[in-house]
């Protein structure tokens, strides 16, 4: 029987799940439970030609898992009869010691719980998903795959913050980096697409989704990345601020009377594109820029301009770090689907060897494609990410 792996990605109010054949790369089923804990919860699963949906309240992540399993049964893909060999779990933060794909036991779950302060939006729901899945599949191996793994061996100068060294060492403060599974996957896919050795390429990878990060990759090894100790640093994101002067936080604490928890919530949930423009969906943002009332238009335009400004700064910095860049890769929801973001991120960079083909950039596609001009010294690609497949393949290597 063909081997399959169930991959779970637990968010604060959602559970994404996918059933894959790691050997062939085929996705057998793909689903999501959204708005967990709210009255308007919804769940859907696409399995082959069949789509199953539910709209019933899902109070917690354990209930979300039961809902997911029910969707599989309803779609005729009972998990007990599809050759399931492992359950893979995306875990955002593994701290200083956890970075290789790791078999999950009770001690590991306790460790992941202790790391919640490093990824308060991501690690707690991941632990809930792990606990629920281990109850549902007690006889299967469960594997944690860490977002931070790919960046574990960053150059010391890139990983080190210029703060008191004793404090850094005592509290394991360093640049960990995130979206590593995605950055590694698409950089490898870029080499395959171009039919050249990965070791020969210098790349800038731009993972632009609700969370967003950039990386500079030389010869298949990352030499810098935009996210840091936590997933808050770097690019402007859907609800996260990205880079911000630490003095702003001290000022808000001292002068505005905000607590540490309030500041953290503001940075994580009420900043970024939402904080400036009141919206995280770039499709809506573009609509407001084009046809909103004056206030909506100004706010949306400011959010977009700040987003692009920060993105261009990182591209420029990574061009300088790499010296020259063979490939720039856009991936994730915004990176794969928003032609305007890609255009504006790279506009005016012809002297740096980066030229887009306007027609190719505007042409939608769900497969890897080149969008740079034939005359462009730097190749620009759009490559769909597939973190779930990468996680599934990591699982079978461990078990």
Curated annotation (Swiss-Prot):
GO terms for molecular function: acetate kinase activity; ATP binding; magnesium ion binding. It comes from the Bacteria. Keywords: ATP-binding, Cytoplasm, Kinase, Magnesium, Metal-binding, Nucleotide-binding, Transferase. ATP binds at residues 16, 207-211, 281-283, 333-337. Mg(2+). Can also accept Mn(2+). Its EC number is 2.7.2.1. The active site is at residue 147. Catalyzes the formation of acetyl phosphate from acetate and ATP. Can also catalyze the reverse reaction. Homodimer. This is Acetate kinase. It comes from Mycobacterium sp. (strain KMS). The gene is ackA.
């Amino acid at each position: 029987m063909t081997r399959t792996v169930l991959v779970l990605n637990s968010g604060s109010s959602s559970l994404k799940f996918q059933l894959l054949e790691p050997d062939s790369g085929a996705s057998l089923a793909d689903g999501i439970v959204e708005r967990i804990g709210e009255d308007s919860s919804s769940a859907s699963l696409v399995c082959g030609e069949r789509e199953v949906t539910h709209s019933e309240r899902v109070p917690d992540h354990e209930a979300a898992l039961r809902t997911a399993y029910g969707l599989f049964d309803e779609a005729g893909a009972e998990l007990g009869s599809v050759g399931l060999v492992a359950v893979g779990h995306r875990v955002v933060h593994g701290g200083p010691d956890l970075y290789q794909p790791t078999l999950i036991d009770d001690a590991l779950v306790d460790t992941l719980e202790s790391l919640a302060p490093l990824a308060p939006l991501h690690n707690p729901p991941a632990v809930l998903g792990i606990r629920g899945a281990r109850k549902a599949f007690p006889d299967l191996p469960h594997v944690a795959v860490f977002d931070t793994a790919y960046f574990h061996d960053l150059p010391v100068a890139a990983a080190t913050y210029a703060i008191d060294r004793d404090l850094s060492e005592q509290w394991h403060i360093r640049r960990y980096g995130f979206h590593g599974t995605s950055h590694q996957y698409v950089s490898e896919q870029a080499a395959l697409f171009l039919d050249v050795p990965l070791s020969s390429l210098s790349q800038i990878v731009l993972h632009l989704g609700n969370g967003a990060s950039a990386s500079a990759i030389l010869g298949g090894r990352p030499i810098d990345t935009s996210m840091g100790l936590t997933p808050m640093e770097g690019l402007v994101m859907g609800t996260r601020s990205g880079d911000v002067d630490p003095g702003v936080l001290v000022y808000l604490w001292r002068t505005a009377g905000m607590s540490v928890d309030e500041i953290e919530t503001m940075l994580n949930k009420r900043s970024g594109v939402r904080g400036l423009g009141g919206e995280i969906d770039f499709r809506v943002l573009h609509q407001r820029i084009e046809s909103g009332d004056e206030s909506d238009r100004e706010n949306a335009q400011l959010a977009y301009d700040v987003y692009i400004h920060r993105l261009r700064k990182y591209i420029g910095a990574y061009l300088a770090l790499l010296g020259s860049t063979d490939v720039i890769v856009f991936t994730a929801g915004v990176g794969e689907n928003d032609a305007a973001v890609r255009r504006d991120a790279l506009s005016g960079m012809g002297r740096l060897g980066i030229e887009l083909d306007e027609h190719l950039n505007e042409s939608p596609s769900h497969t890897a494609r080149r969008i740079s001009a034939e005359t462009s010294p730097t190749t620009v690609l759009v490559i769909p990410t597939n973190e779930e497949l990468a996680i599934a393949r990591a699982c079978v290597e461990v078990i």
